[in-house]
């Protein structure tokens, strides 16, 4: 069975193709990226050895994630397929509705980018450390896997508003601005003000917004 990105791509509904990126592994990640990955993962492994759920450390290996190198999406899919899941790479934040639909399909969306050395301890934008090492290992836990899938089934049916869309776009813009090394403090300030303005215009919490909060409180944290 092939786990190439092209094969996985064809299994995804066409309207979601616009959000899928291509992981050209050898061209996209350089030696510095690999060094950052090793540093972050070794620190994480040391910190979580005694505090993480036992499933997590076992799940790293079971989902194709190594401490020594950035994971290849093909290698991850070979492992995830045994758990009934797949993974694709995406370019940063994608709309919550698209994210939930992928989750309903048991497809894990993983950010393509690798954080920079300047943002080695924390990155404001989604990156492959957070998306792969942060979420994939827990899929090895059957109850968590069922929960995540069910969340997607419910989330894809949730009603959302125009305000939700505007907040998402402002949040994505801010994360992009913070991710650019050349972005000025003034540009970040403007992006933050733009997001706050959109948040202040929200007059009602939609089903989608409430589910997003629950997702942050359970899946993200």
Predicted regions and their residues:
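The feature captures two recurrent sequence modes
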Residues: 1-188
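Extended, Lys/Arg-enriched charged tracts that mediate electrostatic binding to polyanionic substrates
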Residues: 168, 172-175, 180-221
């Amino acid at each position: 069975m092939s786990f190439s990105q092209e094969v996985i791509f064809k299994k995804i509904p066409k309207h979601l193709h616009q959000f899928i990126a291509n992981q050209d592994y050898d061209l996209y990640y350089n030696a510095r990226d690999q060094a950052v990955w090793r540093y972050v993962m070794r620190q994480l492994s040391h910190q979580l050895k005694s505090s993480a759920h036992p499933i997590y450390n076992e799940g790293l290996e079971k989902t194709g994630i190594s401490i020594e190198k950035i994971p290849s999406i093909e290698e991850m899919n070979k492992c995830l397929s045994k758990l009934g899941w797949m993974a694709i790479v995406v370019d940063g934040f994608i709309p919550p509705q698209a994210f939930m639909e992928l989750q309903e399909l048991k497809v894990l969306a993983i950010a393509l980018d690798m954080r920079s050395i300047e943002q080695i301890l924390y990155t404001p934008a989604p990156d492959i450390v957070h998306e792969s090492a942060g979420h994939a290992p827990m899929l090895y836990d059957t109850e968590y896997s069922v929960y995540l899938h069910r969340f997607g089934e419910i989330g894809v049916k949730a009603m959302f508003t125009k305000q939700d869309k505007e907040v998402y776009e402002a949040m994505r813009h801010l994360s992009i601005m913070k991710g650019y090394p050349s972005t000025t403090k003034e540009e970040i300030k403007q992006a933050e003000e733009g997001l706050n303005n959109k948040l202040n215009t929200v007059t009602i919490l939609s089903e989608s917004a409430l589910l997003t909060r629950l997702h942050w409180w359970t899946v993200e944290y």
